Amino acid sequence: MIRRQNSAFNPKLFAFLIHSFSYLNLPQYPQRNLRVISVITGEIKSKIDQIWDAFASGGISNPLEVIEQMTYLLFIRRLDEIQITKEKKANRLKTAVEKPIFTPEQDHLRWSKFITLGDPTQLYSTIANEVFPFIKSIGSEDDTTYSHHMKDARFTIPNAALLTKVVDLLAAVPMDDKDTKGDIYEYMLGKIASAGRNGQFRTPRHIIKMIVELMQPKPTDTICDPACGTAGFLVAASEYLNEHHSTEIFANPEAAKRFSEETFFGYDFDSTMLRIGSMNMMLHGVENPSIENRDSLSEAHSHIESQFSLILANPPFAGSLDYESCAKNIQAIVKTKKTELLFLALFLRLRWIKLKNKLS
């Protein structure tokens, strides 16, 4: 974590920075009351493991595909929870439901409705032929980030027996507490980490929270993760802003629009990660972040710079690139094929553009 001391960019400093992080005089931040880390119980982990085993027995063993299909189902469940909250508020205020997710004609598409069907064949037909197309269409009228990445989404659970088992197991997992939801999802993402696909290793959620707390993002920040994966850093930043600056970010329609559309930027070249990241952001109230399919290290995208005031990221620590495929302005900072060092060079380049930018 480095704060910029002056505006003169000197690429030769990079080698010094790489070898001297432990000797830097890092800024001192006031002591903060970081939130207590909640840990899911062994019973909940066992339920998630049972779901994982069910997918494997049903012919889906790719960890990323399992995560993707489970995310769709969790997303569907969360949409119903949001609708229920809206309905309770409307009943309390004696008003109409504000921006309902489901119309009365779509009531049967809600999680709380279809899990009571009882007939596995009918359940499969409802989810595969109605619910999944419904979640793919959300935001399509406005061509949002979410709808863009969902265009190629596929429902790959092959049969009614597997779907019924997975839905029943997921329904038994308690998700009333926000931290528990996050811990459950982190535990699921740990399955990707154990697979080690394409250098995709999750950053533990409590580490992400700590970094965001130290950086103290503000409503005026433009926040970027050039290797965003499932958008964990961006989600944590949005939660921080909601908790500490809710009055400012929702002060008026223009401020709310800026928060939703002009604050968060994430890049990744894995389409599955982009879909999961978009859903993750949407579930946390950021409806249209700029999450794009980009290889941040490539020459084709060497222009991404200048608009970011805060970089939050954990570089991939696996793999290497050919010199020819890497952006020249990154190679000018460090001559290496290692992706973790190339990403550090990218972070420094992005951070160095503006005075007082921050990097963590």
Regions found by a protein language model. Name each.
Residues V66, M70, L274, T336-S360:
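Conserved Class I SAM-dependent methyltransferase catalytic core
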Residues G190, E239, I353:
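Glycine-rich, acidic and aromatic/proline-enriched surface loops and short helix-turn segments
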